[in-house]
Amino acid sequence: NLLQFNKMIKEETGKNAIPFYAFYGCYCGGGGQGKPKDGTDRCCFVHDCCYGRLVNCNTKSDIYSYSLKEGYITCGKGTNCEEQICECDRVAAECFRRNLDTYNNGYMFYRDSKCTETSEEC
């Protein structure tokens, strides 16, 4: 769920999802259009695509289990939806960590109206 995803992001990056990732670029936060602005925004694009492949799953509220050991997130057992949501969130949180050095404060609270390029396919 969203609270778990926020916790995962904090554990991986040291940053809170809000404000650092909730409204970043063209894809972080609700919806998305255009081309991802940088590596961090691409993490969100891939996360959106991952969620988009999940059928009949409540990505915002399904509670999953995971553990953090020696800096690695491991998703636990649960329903098919819970396990898949956890994997989508884990991959995104790790992607955010890999892209910390290119995080651009100029893309925080970025306006959707600036995301006018043709959207990519998942």
From Swiss-Prot:
Its cofactor is Ca(2+). Ca(2+) binds at residues 27, 29, 31, 48. Expressed by the venom gland. GO terms for cellular component: extracellular region. It catalyses: a 1,2-diacyl-sn-glycero-3-phosphocholine + H2O = a 1-acyl-sn-glycero-3-phosphocholine + a fatty acid + H(+). Keywords: Calcium, Disulfide bond, Hydrolase, Lipid degradation, Lipid metabolism, Metal-binding, Neurotoxin, Presynaptic neurotoxin, Secreted, Toxin. Its EC number is 3.1.1.4. It is found in: Secreted. It is an enzyme of class 3 (hydrolase). Snake venom phospholipase A2 (PLA2) that inhibits neuromuscular transmission by blocking acetylcholine release from the nerve termini. PLA2 catalyzes the calcium-dependent hydrolysis of the 2-acyl groups in 3-sn-phosphoglycerides. Binds 1 Ca(2+) ion. Disulfide bonds join 26-115, 28-44, 43-95, 49-122, 50-88, 57-81, 75-86. The keyword Ribosomal protein does not apply. Its main location: secreted. One of its GO terms (biological process) is arachidonate secretion. The active site is at residues 47, 89. This is Neutral phospholipase A2 agkistrodotoxin.
